């Protein structure tokens, strides 16, 4: 009996010693094992290893990630409080060449992304770099699940010194059932997997000296096939008004604020990481506020390109996009300009905007059929309006066209004074608009239009004239125009006309010019068209 107890005691002691030796061996050799691949892009080092053999668990503390090549256009370095390897195949480490782990968990990693200052900043550069980092680490073994908790990062440019241009925090990833021998570049973890969820908060990027982009948060869940972005902002350091005043040239200064953007019914053909491509059933944009400002006191750029129309704008999207429906809710779009000789902008405000755009395809090789746009808004708070646009996909460069039908509900005509502003030489003192409808058949050079503009009791008053001359000319103007234009009137007028497109201005400028020309065609006589008309500058309309 005593001999048996001695034997059991010896075996137990031998087992304890063996476990201790194995744990010490693993602690000593693990760093060499995880850095054994000569083709690895990063070195993974750590100061402390805690091996728990019975739990099949290894915990690494004070981890550092550093690139093996430091002369690349962009690099990532990282530190972590701890990393846990759970469900480790101990026998595989001891007697095999493969490191098999059930779960790899990163706690509070901090990343530093650095790029050479001479290289242009592209958001895809950052996501590509992180995808490469995760792929490099996870490919060092057979890892079934990956968890990253509470990560953060900073972005720097490098010239003579480091300059910070961005940051993020609360970065989380959970990837389940990875197949590390099967590459798939759709997600942050670049392997085939059963499911992945990820989230991030407080992303900020300084795009240039004046313009910045921020994102309050995003989340992605592959099981729900949904991608959420909240509080997106594209803004100038002070405002787009101040930026337009400082600028040496005339151009569009655009600020964007979006409360919520959601992409749903995401196809497996999509890639939401690295080189973006989005194939989805529905994109919902809630509470978009877009403000576009132009300062006409500044000269246009000498080499200014021609502006595209609807099809061309879709093709300018910098990544492949194929979406069944884009839905816009609770939004506002403002087009503002500072007229020549003025210091304050006037604006067109499309409030309470809702829209639905179907069959949106950015790659011309995939385009077929037509894109349909339906929109409703209230113009400057007084004129409810609707618009339907059909955009055929021509797939031919320089052959854009669209057909538009729009209508505006009744409103008081004096409300137009705030919109017409400095574009005309008169004020509207009274009158009501009963119906305004326009159809347009537009190509890249001109639009053929038909318009109904029904109004009654229209009266005008000239601006900025001596009192006697002002009274006389205002009386003459009201004699020459038709005070009423209703279907029951004998001289009821509609307008069939053409509007030449200014190729250096956008599509909405063509729509506005067509509306303006149609109103002038119907309401005033020849004298008023001369008074109200705006002549093209000698440069073919570039300054308009």
What is each residue range found by the language model?
Residues 45-118, 131-160, 164-167, 174-232, ...:
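Flexible beta-edge/linker motif
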Residues 99-101, 198, 215, 256, ...:
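Glycine-rich, small/hydroxylated-residue low-complexity segments
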């Amino acid at each position: 009996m005593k001999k048996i107890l001695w034997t059991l005691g010896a075996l137990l002691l031998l087992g304890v010693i063996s476990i201790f030796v194995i744990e010490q061996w693993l602690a000593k050799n693990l760093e060499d094992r995880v850095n054994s691949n000569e083709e690895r892009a990063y070195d993974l080092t750590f100061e402390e290893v805690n091996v728990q053999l019975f739990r099949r668990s290894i915990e690494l503390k004070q981890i550092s990630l550093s690139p093996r090549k430091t002369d690349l256009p962009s690099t990532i370095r990282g530190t972590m409080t701890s990393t846990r390897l759970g469900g480790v195949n101990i026998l595989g480490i001891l007697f095999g060449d493969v490191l098999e782990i059930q779960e790899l968990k990163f706690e509070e990693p901090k990343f530093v992304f650095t790029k050479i200052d001479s290289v242009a900043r592209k958001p895809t550069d950052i996501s590509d770099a992180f995808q490469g980092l995760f792929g490099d680490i996870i490919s060092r073994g057979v890892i079934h699940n990956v968890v990253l908790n509470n990560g953060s990062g900073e972005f720097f440019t490098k010239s003579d010194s480091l300059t910070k241009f961005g940051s993020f925090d609360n970065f989380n990833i959970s990837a389940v059932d990875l197949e590390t021998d099967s590459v798939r570049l759709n997600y942050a973890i670049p392997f085939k997997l059963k499911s992945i969820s990820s989230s991030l908060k407080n992303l900020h990027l300084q795009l240039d000296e004046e313009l910045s982009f921020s994102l309050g948060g995003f989340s992605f869940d592959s099981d729900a096939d949904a991608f959420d972005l909240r509080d997106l902002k594209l803004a100038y350091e002070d405002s787009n008004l101040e930026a337009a005043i400082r600028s040496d040239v005339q151009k569009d200064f655009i600020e964007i604020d979006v409360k919520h953007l959601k992409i749903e019914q995401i196809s497996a053909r999509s890639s939401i990481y690295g080189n973006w491509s989005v194939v989805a059933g529905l994109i919902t944009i809630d509470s978009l506020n877009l403000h576009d400002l132009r300062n006409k006191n500044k000269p246009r750029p000498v080499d200014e390109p021609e502006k595209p129309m609807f099809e061309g704008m879709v093709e300018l999207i910098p990544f492949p996009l194929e979406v069944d429906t884009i839905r816009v809710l609770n939004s506002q779009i403002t087009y503002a300009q500072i007229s020549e000789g003025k210091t304050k902008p006037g604006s067109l405000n499309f409030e309470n905007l809702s829209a639905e755009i179907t069959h949106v395809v950015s790659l011309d090789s995939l385009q077929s059929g037509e894109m349909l746009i339906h929109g409703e808004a209230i113009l400057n708070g007084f004129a409810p309006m609707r618009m339907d646009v059909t955009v055929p996909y021509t797939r031919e460069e320089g052959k854009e066209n669209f057909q538009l039908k729009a209508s505006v509900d009744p409103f008081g005509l004096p409300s137009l004074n705030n919109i017409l502003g400095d574009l005309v030489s008169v004020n509207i003192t009274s009158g009501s608009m009963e119906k305004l409808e326009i159809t347009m058949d537009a190509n890249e050079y001109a639009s053929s239009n038909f318009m109904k503009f029904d109004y009654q009791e229209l009266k005008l008053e000239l601006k900025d004239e001596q009192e006697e001359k002002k009274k006389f000319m205002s009386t003459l103007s009201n004699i020459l125009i038709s005070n009423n234009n209703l279907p029951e009137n004998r001289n009821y007028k509609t307008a069939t006309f053409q509007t030449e497109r200014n190729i250096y201005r956008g599509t909405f400028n063509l729509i506005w010019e067509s509306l303006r020309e149609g109103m002038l065609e119907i309401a005033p006589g020849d004298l008023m068209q001369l008074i109200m008309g705006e002549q093209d500058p000698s440069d073919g309309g570039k300054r308009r």
